[in-house]
Amino acid sequence: MISVLIPTYDYNTLPLVTELHQQLSVADIAFEIIVQDDASPLNSNTDNNQKINLLSDCRFERNDTNLGRGQNRNALIQKAQFDWVLLMDCDMFPKSKGFIQNYIHQIQNSNHSVYFGGLQY
């Protein structure tokens, strides 16, 4: 159903992924969450992000070389296995517990190609 793609660089994305994973699990749909670090230095953020691999249908990957923002996003899109893609910045967080459900509702009940909103920095 949906691939959630999160490019990152030297940022702890575990809290975001944990929240999204919980919401996606409640929605009871097929999903994957992929976080891709763009070759940032190895540190505590990398250690925290490795824990993403412990969540079902989630994975953390790290580029060997820095691709830059655009190429990192494009690389993530190439890895997506579902037709619907939700691109999120690593420093965003859903404003509500219904964030994912709102997106799923729109996907299933309208014919638009692009949706945005419901986030805060």
Language model regions located:
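Acidic donor-diphosphate engagement hotspot in glycosyltransferases and nucleotidyltransferases
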Residues: 16, 44-45, 73, 96-100
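Short aromatic/hydrophobic "clamp" motif used to bind/position activated sugar donors
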Residues: 85
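Acidic donor-binding segment of Leloir-type glycosyltransferases
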Residues: 20-61
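The conserved acidic donor/metal-binding loop of glycosyltransferases
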Residues: 89-93
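Conserved donor NDP-sugar-binding/catalytic core segment of glycosyltransferases
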Residues: 98-121
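N-proximal low-complexity "stem/linker" segments adjacent to membrane-targeting elements
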Residues: 1-22
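Glycine-rich, basic loop-to-helix element that forms the pyrophosphate-binding segment
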Residues: 63-80
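Nucleotide-sugar donor-binding loop of glycosyltransferases
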Residues: 8, 37, 96, 118
